[in-house]
Structures are given as structure tokens and as C-alpha cells.
Amino acid sequence: MKILFPDFSDITGLPNDDSLLLDQHRMLFFGDAHDWLICQQAMSAQFLDYLQHGLELSVPNLLVTGIDRPYQLHETLQPRQLPQALRSRHQLHLLPLMGNAGAHRFAQALRQAGHAVYVEAPDYATFLQLNQKLGFRAVIAALFGEHKLARGCDLQQPGAAEQLWQTSRATQFVLKPNQSTGGFANQVVAHVGELSAHAAQLQGMDLLEEMIPEVVASLSVHIHVAADGRCTLLPLAEQVMAGPAAANGIAYPVALSAATRAALHADLAVFCGYLASVTYRGNCNLDIVVDAAGRHYFIEANARLAAGAVPRAVLSRLFDGCLPAYRFVERKLPGLHRCQEADVLHASLATLDMGRRSGTLVVQSQKLAFDKLAYVCFGDDAAAVSEQEQGFLNALQQPELAQVA
């Protein structure tokens, strides 16, 4: 069961412009059919236009919430003003509960009745809030404007919001089961509409991560941090692997473009500088992939550093400080890969419903032009969440770890 819950009052970070707000909401009127359209009343003159756009959906039920008494709806919007198509094609329901609480309770009741409720909302914060309260375990930021696809997109241009919506709907993800290695048992989620089925299969600590399309090369950069803090890098050209041979560990030289090489070296310089500043000494290596556009992504840095027994809090600050160099959030230790506080959207979600050790920690870098989104999803299998992983979730509540580096 799919619910569309666009709520004007919950939009954040947008100008106070009615046309822009409506355009933002039109993004939600494309895609899969919904079973319910939930509206919050008190939209005055905008409300009728809002319902008109709702006609683009195949929604059999319209629920209006945020009212003290049912007749309040008709004080603002007289029945004769409702489009004939709306009266004939939709069932109008009134929920005399205030604000979002009404939608929460209604959707929760549906879920308790056995429905797999998936709630869409106009902005990422509301989406997280609604779905987390429902216990939905796979959170997808790619549906909404905070996703990287929205950067530089002028939603006031005709059709811009619709194009953004369609593009984000086409984003593919990979669902990695807990304890998977080498890509074993990974599943490709080709469309966000498939997530409901996948979410029901989550157990323990799984990861849903955005796919990097068209990976053309993978590198392993070895770093040695000397006692005096100096960092030594092995030449990149000697470590590049490409094509099917990369999976077998066979190295072949790959001619990276000058721009890619320069950007990579710049990020490595930032990373190495911060390594030295946190008094890390010894060896580590960073695995890197390069896509067809020449963009590079750092992966699995934590696995290498954790092997060196770097203190957890130090690593957390390390990745905060070298954010421009870090473009991937690893599965096993999400706390280490937090970005700055503004980039950790609703970090408190990590502690949500921890009585059953379920919840979702969402980490997203918003400073990079081409970052990768990853979501650590906790299922209902309490035993699968290790003591170490639980420690990271607890650490997120400590004020000193929530400070912006």
C-alpha cells in the first residue's frame, strides 16, 4: 500500500513562493499509483489547486487531516468547489486529528493491519520522519530534492521538477546483505518502487547504496605515514586495475585523464594531511574506483584503518575532517563515516526503536558534487547487530562526536 503525504507546512529550505511549493509537490505526482492521498488542511486558496494536481494520480482515497472538526474542511473549501472528477473518482475521508500526528496514526493503523505502508512526502526530512515512525527500514533520499541530482536544478523553470523526479526515480541501488563479501548475494534494486519488497527481507545490518554507473577503473593507493607525519604515496599508475581483470587482482596500466589525476591527488593530499594531524602512524590503503566521467570515489578506507586499531573517535573525526576526500560510506562501521553534523540527516534515527535494535542510520554528504549515497539498514534480527556496531550507535549520542569538525 502506497500513501502520498505532501504537506506544505513541512517544507524546509525553500523560498516562500507558492508557485515553487506547488512545483516541488508536482514531483510527487509522477511514478507509481498510490492508494491514498493524504492532505493537511488549512491551505486556503492553494488547497483547490493542490487537489486538482492530485487528479493526475490514480488515487481512490483522499484523506484530509489536520482538522479539529470535519466541517472545518467545508468552511475553507465548499463541496461545490470540488472538481466533479474528484467527487466521482475519489473517496473523501476526514481525519479529525491535528497535523502530522493524524497521518502518523492513520498510516500506523494501516501497517498494524498488515499493510506494507510506504509514505512519500515533499521533502526529505518529512519523509524520514513519517517512514521512521512507521518502522520502514529502507530510507531513500534519492526521491527528493536533497539528492545530488537537485544541485543546480532551478525548480522554478517549467518542467524542471518533473524532470528531476523522473531522473531520481531512475537511480539504481545495490542491496548488500549483512556479512556479504566480494559482492556475494548482492541484489540490484533497479527502481525505488521495488524497495518495499526488499525491505521486508532485511536482517541485521544491511546496506542499500547507490550504484556507481560505468566503473571503468579501480585503484588501490597505498599510504605510509612516517613517525614525523610525512605521508608517502605509491605512484598511481603502478596500481591501476581495469576491466574484468580487476576482479582477479591483475593490474594493468590505465591512462587516467590529467583532470582525474589532479583531482585525485588533491583529495589524497587532504586525506593524508588529516591522517597526520590525528597522529596516525603506519600503513593504510584506500581503494578507489573511477567512473566513465572521470569521477573518483574512495571506498573501504575504514576497513584498512580499523585494522591498524585506530581509536574509534579519532576515525570519526578523521572522516569529518577529510570530507572532501571521502565519497563513500562503508557498510560495517557507519559511525566512522559520518560527515559533518549538517550532513548527517536525523542522526538520532540510529537510536530509534533500539529496544528491538531496529532503525536506520542515514549518512549523506551534501558537500560533494558527485557523492555516493549509502544507507545502513537495521532489520529486526537483534543478534545480527554486533556489540561493536551497537557501540557506534551509542557513540552517536555523545555530544563530542556530533560536533562539526
Model regions and ranges:
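Nucleotide-activated donor-dependent transferases that construct or modify glycoconjugates
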Residues: 1-15
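A long amphipathic alpha-helix within ATP-dependent nucleotide-binding catalytic cores
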Residues: 211, 246-295, 332-357
